[in-house]
A protein has these predicted regions:
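Terminal alpha-helical segments
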Residues: 1-155
């Protein structure tokens, strides 16, 4: 499916809307991912579940920045799922396994927040989530820089 057709489907379903987001705002969102990653790392020694949740939040923020750089904003319906779908479409098969992990973490995070009795996040899970988040944030930063090589981002 072409990118235009894919994006139009999401717009028609009211899951996405065109919106120009300033590069300065995108840079701030990316900078927030760095804080999220640091917090997730520190939380490992305190609470695995919250570390996992914060690592996922870093991925979500990076994914949102990626959607913003494309000129769109997720609407109020299914924002997290939409961000995963948009990043999957544009990053393609090269990062398929990482995007699948992002989606898996999205589902686990949902259970952790809304039905915590259904999930037990281990130290191994939390460390794996942090590693995936670090990798994902780096990829998104590289993609944003690649799309705007003329900008000297400070992230």
């Amino acid at each position: 499916m072409t990118s235009d057709r894919f994006l139009n489907e999401y717009i028609e379903k009211k899951l996405l809307k065109p919106e120009k987001i300033g590069l300065d705002q995108i840079e701030k969102v990316i900078k927030s991912t760095e804080k999220d990653l640091k917090v997730a790392e520190k939380l490992l020694s305190i609470d695995e579940g919250h570390s996992y949740d914060t690592a996922y939040t870093a991925m979500l923020h990076a994914g949102r920045a990626f959607v913003f750089i494309k000129g769109f904003r997720p609407t109020t319906n299914f924002q997290h799922k939409t961000v995963v779908a948009i990043t999957a479409h544009f990053l393609g098969d090269k990062y398929k396994v990482l995007i699948e992990k992002f989606d898996y973490m999205r589902k686990n995070r949902n259970n952790f927040i809304y039905e915590p009795w259904k999930i037990n996040i281990s130290m191994t899970d939390a460390k794996s989530a942090l590693k995936s988040a670090q990798e994902f944030v780096k990829i998104i930063k590289d993609e944003i820089q690649r799309e705007h090589p003329q900008i000297n981002f400070k992230f």
